[in-house]
Amino acid sequence: MLNIGPFTFKSRLLLGTGKFSDYDVQRKAIEVSEAEILTFAVRRMDIFDAQQPNLLEKIDIKNYTLLPNTAGAKTAEEAVRIAKLAKASGLCDMVKVEVIGDDKTLLPDPVETLKASEMLLEEGFIVLPYTSDDVVLARKLQELGVHAIMPGASPIGSGLGIVNPLNISFIIEQATVPVIVDAGVGSPADAAFAMELGADGVLLNTAVSGAKDPIKMAEAMKLGIHAGRLGFEAGRIARKRFATASSPLEGMSVVE
């Protein structure tokens, strides 16, 4: 089970709702993924205007927990305003804090992310900050009282997978809240690797929506995450420099 604040989820896959070719593909991919948490950018929708396109209009949202994110924010104050807008519309008061500090890499601004998280915690939000793989920053966010840490595997939408597994593993080892690997996942193998490292979940979007067959990829990601989690719980064998025979040598007859 994945526990975030007061919520408990069976699925460890969190799925973004953007960039799908059409609403029908989006809906089918979400259903196949069995994700229970759907994230979306508040700025991409006019959530107070029923006449405007709505990324969630073809989804039976009562079956899901919605995770609005503050994508587009460049400052802590902007992030807080976006989060409050989502909450005022009646959406879940759980929010993914995203404050971008660089337009080319889309890497998060560590100072503004820390500030926004603190402000939103004071407002009573359930806070899930998207951050880099900075181990110290992850610890400082945890000390603030955030409800989960969301370190990026690599830049958003890059599909590079986990470029710094050592830092991700350090973040996981020191964590007392769930660690959800976010951004840069490109394949089921990437998702499985994140889970093998001990992550509590994986959030992805482009890897599914940008695939040749998003529906098949959604299922593949679900299975990859499940396999990776089972592997982590089972415990992999230790790496060794030399071979170890898998068949016992004792009792073997010697052929003259």
From Swiss-Prot:
Catalyzed chemical reaction(s): [ThiS sulfur-carrier protein]-C-terminal-Gly-aminoethanethioate + 2-iminoacetate + 1-deoxy-D-xylulose 5-phosphate = [ThiS sulfur-carrier protein]-C-terminal Gly-Gly + 2-[(2R,5Z)-2-carboxy-4-methylthiazol-5(2H)-ylidene]ethyl phosphate + 2 H2O + H(+)
Binding positions for 1-deoxy-D-xylulose 5-phosphate per the UniProt entry: G157, A183, G184, N205, T206
Biological processes annotated in GO: thiamine diphosphate biosynthetic process
Pathway(s) it belongs to: Cofactor biosynthesis; thiamine diphosphate biosynthesis
Keyword Transferase belongs to the record: yes
Annotated compartments: Cytoplasm
Annotated transmembrane regions: none
Key words, A-Z: Cytoplasm, Schiff base, Thiamine biosynthesis, Transferase
Residues annotated as the enzyme's active site: K96 (schiff-base intermediate with dxp)
HAMAP family: ThiG
UniProt xrefs under PANTHER family: THIAZOLE SYNTHASE
Record function comment: Catalyzes the rearrangement of 1-deoxy-D-xylulose 5-phosphate (DXP) to produce the thiazole phosphate moiety of thiamine. Sulfur is provided by the thiocarboxylate moiety of the carrier protein ThiS. In vitro, sulfur can be provided by H(2)S.
Quaternary structure annotation from Swiss-Prot or TrEMBL: Homotetramer. Forms heterodimers with either ThiH or ThiS.
Protein name in the entry: Thiazole synthase
Taxon lineage: Bacteria, Bacillati, Bacillota, Bacilli, Bacillales
Gene for this chain: thiG
